[in-house]
C-alpha cells in the first residue's frame, strides 16, 4: 500500500493562522480604500464555462486552463464515441483570471451602472510549471472601471492603488503603465511580422517576470529572428523614457495616439 502524502499538490500552499491574519489585514485595507473611491465588490464562481474561457488568453494561456472533466455517464459516452474533441470531454474550467469573468458579468447584467466601478479579490488557478515565486493557485486583486476609455478613469484607478500601498506602509514604489496600441507599434517598428505580433505581445508581458534574457530566449524559441528580437528590446527600453514618449506622441505614426494617452494619464495622475 502506497504512503499517503501529507503535502499539498505541487504549486499549491497551506496558509496557517499567522499567514491568514496578515492576508486578512491587507485585504481589509484594500477593501476600505477601494470602497472610499466608490468601487463596489464583485465575486464570481470558481468554475466558468470553457466556452467563456477559451480563446481569451492566446494559445499559451489556453494550455494553462484547468479543465473539469465530464462526470460518469457523459464522460463514458464521449470516450466510447471514438476520438472526442476537447469540449466533448470537458465544458467547464477553473477561473484563470478576474478579467474575463468581469467581461462576462458586464455582458450578462444589463442593469449595471454605465460606469461600473468594481474591485474583485479571489484566487485563480493556472496549470503552470511551479517555480520559485510562481504557484498554480494564487490570489488576484483587480480594480477596474468599465464603460469609459477616459484617462481620468485610469488615473482614478492608479490613485486608488497608490493609496492602498501608502496605507500599507510602502513609500518607494512605482506603478507601471502600458498601452496596447503603443506596444503594437513598437513590435511593428522592430520589424516583427504581423502574424507574430500576438505571440510577441504575450512574451513582452513577461518582461518583469523573466527579464530581458528570458524574453530574448522565448522569442527566439518561437521563431522570431535574433536581430528583430534585439531591435524590439532596444525599442522597449527607449520607450520607457519620457522624452521618447513625447517624441512618439508628437508624430503621426500608429503608436502616437497611445503615447499621447499615456502622457495625458501621467498628467492626470500627477
Model-inferred region functions:
Residues 2-270:
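Extended, charged alpha-beta segments that form solvent-exposed binding/catalytic grooves
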